[in-house]
């Protein structure tokens, strides 16, 4: 179980959030307006930033989708996903291609280097890479950015299918994404804004 205990983050004298406490053992949506600190909170959970006060327990191995896609631009979609897997690409290729079809990426797009994909296609690659990575906790920062409504529905369905019973924190302020997922919503601004 992921535990946030009295987590505080401030930049200079200005607190971003204060005394945030939460336990997560299943998928949840972290909702707050832009600028509240959702990305900073996820960065703390990933170990990329330190909180000003408080502690985090039970994160374990993390897989993440950042706001920036962080793909290897010269590799194609399947190769970007297999980077996080043991063994050879051929071992997983068919299953990964099936997942890409499920979220609306055709065979032609799968052959392109990541640098030639659209923004929405890059998000799908980043999302599948996180889903395929061996992890204890999944952290997703606005994972549906650049996706059309149909693709968002498909991606949300795949997340619902794959993430049951695992700590998943999906940060967004997109109401359509929240509806598509149907996960419990944690309104961060009501919990930890001073």
Where are each of the predicted segments found?
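Hydrophobic anchor residue at the start of the ABC signature
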Residues: 127
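Conserved signature/switch motifs of ABC ATPase nucleotide-binding domains
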Residues: 133
